């Protein structure tokens, strides 16, 4: 019997319906040279032969040392984490709507919420969002719903916000009447000049978005921007790397009254790099805004016998209860990734997280300092950073990155795609996984490549 599920008549009907002339046309976005017509495997080989062949081919892969960052980070993941996550109780668990049958999963989410609220200094956390960009978009929608005093649906955003986050934000809010104004960054320090905010003082904003560390790795003037936003009646949305909060003050301490909503990408905490996902976004907020928070929230309660238990709470916010009035059409969470993050934070504890963050900063500082000793290479901005820093090169950065790949090093993130004035700049990121020997190899490879391409 055939294991192909669709008959030719069904395929033709499908193509006619969507207006495609052939199945190949469905995949014409994929360049021809990337498509494989055959797998180059002999017919009739047995499983042992096939396994040996795949091993030989896999050995042709090589793993560069990664210094890219820019929103997804290489951190050490203790072996115990994914060994636990892969257990059937977590790996195959379904939505925990039936609380009496889902106490283990619900408790994990509750512990995650508790730790994220503690890390960010906020009162409440949801069970996670799809990713950092989605979490920001939902935070903006949440802020507009919450800020009843705002006379507009305008949001003020610093130019140093991650460009991918901005694109997702614009896509999700495109047809919702929300407008964005952008504050240009200071070319000398790579962050928002607080004095420039006065140019926007006559506009009413529902929210102000502050990313710190920002896309260029710099620490924003969070106190000044937060106070300015609150003075002008806007809620403050903090976008941050959760790992940085182990050594930096929490968003709850920004300015006189702290941020109102905190969000970001949770991938650094126990989730491996995987071509863009699956990752998870986190969102926390002050209690005043919790009823406008999207996604799931797990609460702690007691049963009829007085025993402690956990359940999904405040569900009237969600679209499976009140679709027309829901806070979001997100009615899920990244449960498996959250489980990994919960175990990661539990295993490392506060001291472990602080150690990881400190070593990451120190390694980035060392790498940047050593690079700046090379003729023609310099640190771009004169302000504080966490674990990413922009480096100016005497050659085209994209060419430099390509040549460094030949030295088995992913040298950094090419910034010219988003900032034309940074065509000769890369952003480098180091974490606790990079050794002093790795950094020495990077420096020597840089000298070698610059000599080769004329730097």
From Swiss-Prot:
Keywords: Oxidoreductase. Gene3D superfamilies: Aspartate Aminotransferase, domain 1 (3.90.1150.10), Type I PLP-dependent aspartate aminotransferase-like (Major domain) (3.40.640.10). It is an enzyme of class 1 (oxidoreductase). The keyword Glycoprotein does not apply. SUPFAM superfamilies: PLP-dependent transferases. Its EC number is 1.4.4.2. One of its GO terms (molecular function) is glycine dehydrogenase (decarboxylating) activity. It comes from the Bacteria. HAMAP family: GcvPA (MF_00712). Belongs to the GcvP family. N-terminal subunit subfamily. The glycine cleavage system is composed of four proteins: P, T, L and H. In this organism, the P 'protein' is a heterodimer of two subunits. This is Probable glycine dehydrogenase (decarboxylating) subunit 1. It comes from Francisella tularensis subsp. tularensis (strain SCHU S4 / Schu 4). The lineage of its organism: Bacteria, Pseudomonadati, Pseudomonadota, Gammaproteobacteria, Thiotrichales. The gene is gcvPA.
């Amino acid at each position: 019997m055939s294991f192909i599920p669709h008959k030719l008549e069904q395929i033709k009907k499908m193509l006619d319906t969507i207006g495609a002339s052939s199945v190949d046309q469905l995949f014409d976005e994929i360049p021809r040279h990337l498509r494989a017509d055959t797998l180059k495997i002999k017919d009739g080989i047995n499983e042992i032969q096939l396994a040996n062949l795949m091993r030989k081919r896999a050995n042709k892969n090589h793993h560069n040392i990664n210094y890219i960052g820019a929103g997804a980070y290489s951190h050490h993941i203790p072996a115990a984490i994914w060994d636990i996550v892969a257990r059937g109780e977590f790996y195959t668990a379904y939505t925990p709507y039936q609380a009496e049958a889902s106490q283990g999963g619900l408790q994990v989410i509750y512990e995650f919420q508790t730790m994220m609220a503690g890390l960010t200094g906020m009162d409440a956390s949801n069970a996670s969002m799809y990713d950092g960009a989605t979490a920001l978009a939902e935070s903006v929608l949440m802020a507009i719903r919450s800020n009843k005093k705002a006379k507009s649906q305008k949001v003020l955003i610093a130019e140093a916000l991650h460009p991918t986050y901005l694109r997702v934000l614009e896509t999700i809010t495109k047809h919702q009447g929300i407008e964005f104004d952008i504050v240009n960054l200071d070319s000398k320090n790579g962050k928002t000049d607080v004095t420039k905010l006065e140019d926007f003082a006559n506009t009413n904003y529902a929210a102000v978005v502050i990313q710190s560390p920002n896309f260029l790795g710099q620490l924003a003037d969070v106190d000044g921007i937060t106070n300015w936003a609150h003075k002008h009646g806007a809620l403050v949305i903090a976008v941050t790397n959760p790992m940085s909060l182990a050594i930096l003050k929490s968003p709850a301490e920004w300015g006189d009254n702290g941020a109102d909503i905190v969000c970001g990408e949770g991938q650094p905490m126990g989730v491996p790099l995987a071509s863009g996902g699956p990752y998870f976004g986190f969102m926390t907020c002050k209690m005043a805004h919790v009823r406008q928070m999207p996604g799931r929230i797990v609460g702690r309660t007691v049963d009829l016998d007085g025993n402690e238990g956990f359940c999904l709470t405040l569900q009237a916010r969600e679209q499976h209860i009140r679709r027309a009035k829901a806070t979001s059409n997100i009615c899920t969470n990244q449960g498996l990734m959250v489980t990994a993050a919960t175990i990661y934070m539990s295993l490392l504890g506060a001291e472990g997280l602080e150690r990881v963050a400190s070593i990451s900063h120190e390694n980035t500082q060392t790498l940047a300092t050593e690079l700046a000793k090379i003729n023609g290479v310099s640190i771009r901005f004169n302000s504080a950073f966490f674990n990413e820093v922009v480096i100016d090169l005497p050659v085209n950065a994209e060419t430099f990155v390509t040549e460094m790949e030949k030295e088995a090093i992913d040298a950094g993130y090419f910034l010219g795609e988003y900032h034309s004035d940074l065509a000769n700049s890369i952003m480098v990121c180091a974490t606790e996984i990079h050794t002093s020997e790795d950094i020495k190899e990077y420096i020597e490879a840089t000298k070698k490549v610059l000599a080769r391409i004329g730097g």
